[in-house]
């Protein structure tokens, strides 16, 4: 593979949906830029694993502090920091050269086959909430996830 091939993204799918055209491409997320970077988050917004941990690491301590403050404020009212199916928008901090916003999306954990089927039924609501958030953001045309 030539060195320039590493940076190329492969188009897997393009579909029209009620929100516009959705293109699914593959490749290293760090070789892309866009208006929004979407991260799969846990309900504490802690950036503990996977892509979310990488994003927190690259965005810097400011992002960790902001998400920690969101958690503290929600605990004051006895609410989860970010409930399943919901999302939170933050600044990109150290990733601002590539993105305008980060959206932390809390979806249901469906990794184990013996989990309650009701969790899987939360996935459509998670995506609907994400697309509603994106529709409310006036400066978004490219989303990286």
Enumerate the predicted regions with their spans.
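Macrodomain-like recognition of ADP-ribose-binding/processing modules
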Residues: 1-145
């Amino acid at each position: 593979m030539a060195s320039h091939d590493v940076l190329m993204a492969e188009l897997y799918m393009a579909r029209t949906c009620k929100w516009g055209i959705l293109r699914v491409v593959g490749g290293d997320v760090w070789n892309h830029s866009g208006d929004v970077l979407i991260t799969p988050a846990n309900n504490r917004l802690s950036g503990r694993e996977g892509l979310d941990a990488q994003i927190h690491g690259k965005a810097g301590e400011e992002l960790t502090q902001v998400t920690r403050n969101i958690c503290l404020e929600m605990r004051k009212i006895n609410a989860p920091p970010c409930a399943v199916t919901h999302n939170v928008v933050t600044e990109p901090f150290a990733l601002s050269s590539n993105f305008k916003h980060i959206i932390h999306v809390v979806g249901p954990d469906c990794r184990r086959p013996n989990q309650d089927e009701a969790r899987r039924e939360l996935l459509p609501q998670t995506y609907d909430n994400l697309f509603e958030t994106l529709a409310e953001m006036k400066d978004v045309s490219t989303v990286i996830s």
